[in-house]
């Protein structure tokens, strides 16, 4: 019994095909890039919020870094717990939205997704002119 793609060099389904090495490399690079951007964004947001809180009221910031009888949990451990839950909710939310868009478009691979997005959104015109010369643009007159 032959599969639907036998003889044509095409697999019967997208699940059977391992994909080319270039496609896998593209996926890995894309995943690493998105993970790095997400981690950098989370870290920058957390550090910015922490520095603003310390700048606004340093005495309360220092008071919140140690657990007391009135507050059994220190402010920093509470903040780290909130960061953990917030990160979990953010990752799950983005995953659910991505999955919903993927299923709504009815695509089965990244190539299908790319072609579907290119058909939905307008094309970006390629400008044959050279890039803007910033030195001349920003030069004071």
Curated annotation (Swiss-Prot):
Residue ranges that the UniProt entry lists as topological domain Mitochondrial matrix: 1-29, 103-141
Subunit-level organization: Interacts with the core subunits NDUFAF1, ECSIT and ACAD9 of the MCIA complex. Interacts with ATP5MC3, NDUFC2, TMEM70, MT-ND2 AND MT-ND3.
UniProt function note: Scaffold protein that participates in the c-ring assembly of mitochondrial ATP synthase (F(1)F(0) ATP synthase or complex V) by facilitating the membrane insertion and oligomer formation of the subunit c/ATP5MC3. Participates in the incorporation of the c-ring into vestigial complexes. Additionally influences the incorporation of subunits MT-ATP6, MT-ATP8, ATP5MJ, and ATP5MK in the ATP synthase.
Family: Belongs to the TMEM242 family.
Main subcellular location: mitochondrion
Alphabetized InterPro entries for the sequence: TMEM242
Residues where N-acetylmethionine is found: 1
Domain of life: Eukaryota
One GO process term, biological-process aspect: mitochondrial proton-transporting ATP synthase complex assembly
Protein name: Transmembrane protein 242
Membrane-spanning intervals of the chain: 30-50, 82-102
Subcellular localization: Mitochondrion inner membrane
Gene Ontology CC: mitochondrial inner membrane
Pfam families tied to this protein: DUF1358 (PF07096)
Residue ranges annotated as Mitochondrial intermembrane topological domain: 51-81
Alphabetic keyword roster: Acetylation, Membrane, Mitochondrion, Mitochondrion inner membrane, Transmembrane, Transmembrane helix
């Amino acid at each position: 019994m032959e599969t639907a793609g036998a003889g044509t060099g095409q697999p019967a389904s997208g699940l059977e095909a391992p994909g080319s090495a270039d496609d896998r490399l593209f996926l890995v690079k894309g995943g690493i890039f998105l993970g790095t951007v997400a981690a950098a964004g989370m870290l920058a947001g957390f550090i910015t919020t922490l520095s603003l809180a310390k700048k606004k009221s340093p005495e309360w910031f220092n008071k919140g870094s140690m657990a007391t009888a009135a507050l059994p949990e220190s402010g920093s451990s509470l903040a780290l717990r909130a960061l953990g839950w917030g990160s979990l909710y953010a990752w799950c939310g983005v995953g659910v939205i991505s999955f919903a868009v993927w299923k709504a478009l009815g695509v089965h691979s990244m190539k299908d997704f790319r072609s579907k997005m290119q058909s939905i959104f307008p094309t970006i015109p390629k400008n044959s002119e050279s890039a803007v010369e910033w030195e001349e643009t920003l030069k004071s007159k």
